[in-house]
Amino acid sequence: MVVSFIGMATQEVPVKANLNIVLKSDTEQLEEVMVVAYGTAKKSAFTGSAATIKNEKIATRQTSNVTNALAGQVAGVQTTSNNGQPGKDAEVRIRGIGSISASNKPLYVVDGVPYDGEISAISTSDIESMTVLKDAASNALYGARGANGVILITTKRGKSGEARVTFDAKWGVNKRGVPNYETITDPATFYELNYSSIYNADLKGYAAAGDLAKANAYANQAMLSSTYLGYQVYSIPQGQQLIGMDGKLNPNATLGYSDGTYYYTPDNWSDEIFENNLRQEYNLSISGATEKMNYYMSAGYLDDKGIVPNSGFQRYSARLKADYQVKPWLKMEGNVSFTHYDSREQDTEGGTSNANIFYASNIMGAIYPMYVRDAQGNIMVDNRGFLRYDYGKPGQDSNGSRNTIPNANPLASYMLDKMKYSGDVVSGKWSADIDIWNGIKAKVNIGVDVNNVRATEMVNPFYGQYSETSGVGGLIGVSSERTFSVNQQYLLTYNKTFNDVHNVDILAGHESYDYKYQYLYGQREKLYDPNVPELGNGIMNQSNNSYSRNYATEGWLFRAQYDYDGRYFVSASFRRDASSCFHPDNRWGNFWSVGAGWLLSKEKFLENQSWIDMLKFKISYGLQGNDNLMFQGGLYRNYYPYQDQYTLANSNGDFSTSLYYKGNKEITWETSHSFNTGFDFAFWGGKLGGSVEYFSRKTTDMLYFKPVAASMGYSRFPENVGSMVNRGVELDLYSNIIENKNFSWNVNFNLTHFKNKVLELSPELNGQLIDGARIYREDESMYQLYLPKYVGVDSETGESLWALVTPDENGNTVTKSYSVASENRFASGDILPKVYGGFGTSVTAYGFDLSVSFAYQLGGRILDYTYQGLMDVAATGSALHKDMLKAWTPENKNTDVPRMNINDQYTNRLTDRFLTSSDYLSLQNITLGYTLPKSLTRKMQIDGVRVFFVADNVALLTARKGLDPRQGYVAADNVYSPIRTISGGISLNF
């Protein structure tokens, strides 16, 4: 008797009176086909390491950039985002840090061809899947461009049957996703703490002389002077002090003060800066397929407004993808997309620029007004109809004077200045598949990416450092960037099965890539019309510049795969690559990989283990190259690192040159040695499945800048010296707990643990201090911190104490001198987390669906620079953290917060005091939907209707309120805050 069922392996059993038959899952019938380098492969035959995210997960995320959807979804993939501005990429790192000075960015491949356009130009609704290739066996064929991993993006295509029309719409609200730090917002408390800082310094010696009344009077006078706070926002009776002898606010003080011309009252700068805004998105697609043709076309619109004024991202997108079986032996495909986007942002985001609105929201003290008010307390309006903003500079607006962000008002800049990026991205691909003879096929892929961006920045002529009163009269800058790239692939494949058990798959080919970049910039001052963002609108101090960059690679590639009876698998690949980044003598490099797999579940000794659906062992090793050397500082790529590069200037009408970059003709490929091994498994009919893998990624001949003597005429020199390794384990689990007609419930979990270690360094770099906090040393992580060790305060004086590495000549183990402490650095922890990953669950029942996803990391450390700024005991107008209320006083000696003292310039220096845990738990997404019964929708001539609610970036739990460790590895402060989006929507299928 033959027993069969869909998705289960057919069994033939003898006929008996009573039978108890258990069918095993048919892993061949349910074989998953995955996208890999230059094609597809059965998951069971794949010997490398890869993970796939399907459209179902991508579509739930409300993001203008698909890289943000990777957070917590894939083992071995870590994302950080130091800019929450809509449209911005997340920084993606796959299996650790591959280089010190070269890029760690992965390669993006869209529909088989490397992609150079903006990732934000790809609509998430067009994406069918994303596959992350993590080891050399899976991505070595991409050569140098795949050294840091590869992310394959596959767009949707039509399905057989009648044409399908899909429309979905989302409407929602964007709001700030991370709260403020817990700062002192009460003006009275703010004055009291600043008073104590000045009083404790006893600048005139009155307190030491016992004249406490004079000490009090002087501290009040100094506090309100332009040297310190510079603003009075309380009214007090004539002859009385704002702060009394007890250090507390005068009980007769009332909030609000007028000097006869202006009225001063504090504003909450964060409340004034941040706003809730609308988000809307619409997508329409039409798709279908016949025996000879497959087509998919789509159009989309996204308006993703930001959470600060005049910021956001707007996108219009369209895609047409079709293939046609021209002849029995010839199939051709065309795939073209066009995107126009407008990004509104400020270039001051990040850092401590006076125009950075996020810096202002963090650091502005609790007493300062945002606006200028007349004597009656009304916000004033200038003769152009603009609100008058307080710049903290007497004579420009009010009579107040502040040291925190002087002569600037970031909100005014956002309201009055205009900055915009407009881009057009065209991505086209043409391919032909030719069936030559008896398993031999040829494939041609040609991809072209064109990216044109125009940026305009206009600084208003009315207020601030470029105002008419400052002698400038406004500024206009316009730039144009154009990139053009062509990728050509010519491939030959042979696929054949012999005697039903020997399967051979061979690939050989040639690939070339050409990239051109052009930049043009112009700037002028003194604007005629503040509403016209064009160069012709300015007449003074004209300046301009332009340059171009060219880059090319060429590669010959080969891959062979063999499997026996679907049980034993071996693979090997080879690529010979050339890069224009290197001198012709060092241009070519050879890279390869080997891999093997064993599908144990098909062996006879396991065939009776009904609980094992699939069990596979895999192992691989390979070499890859990296040519992506960055300029010192890591912001821009150097396309000519083997050449000396100069800047040209005007010297009294003659040419003047200066060495900008010292090249090295001997540098060549940085090489990554990748090892991977592990198991893929599925048990109990899909109740539990996943993978566990061990990886090692060793980088040799590292590209980095070696320090040299100043007498050489330059400070650093690029070389191939040193090595580094990342080793770790990955665990990826899923469980289909319940699966039936009306109800399903599944959960997923992934975890990555890895360690970074520098194995070899040039003697000149070994032990060198990096960015004031890290030291590169052999046998340690490149992110190992070395900081002075803060051990609290002297209980009798309230002064800061730091530890000594070894006792001094008097046997002291601590010091009050920061200069001494700065020479006594301790290993203070590793910035890299020990564990990171994500987990989630989804439930469907009777038309309802609910999914929840989380991301987390554990075991790392982060420098909280914002908290450091908020804990300055010598602050003169900057915001103060609530922890300052714990500062040492004679009545509060049991504390680790030093005594307030305006003269203490060292307590706030960088030490391990400002090092905190980077652990976090983030509720990434909640999606709740309901699909109407088909019996109802068919009456409306609609195939399907789904209504849904989606919330992104819902909650974040960290070691300190306001801290967001997701912004960067080392630290990221004063950057665009992450956005929380809450939306509702509808999806229609016809």
List each model region and its residues.
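Switch/connector loops and helix/strand junctions flanking conserved nucleotide-binding motifs
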Residues: 43-45, 141-143, 161-162, 175-178, ...
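Hydrophobic/aromatic-rich, well-ordered segments within soluble, folded domains that form packed cores
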Residues: 286-295, 299, 842-845, 920-932
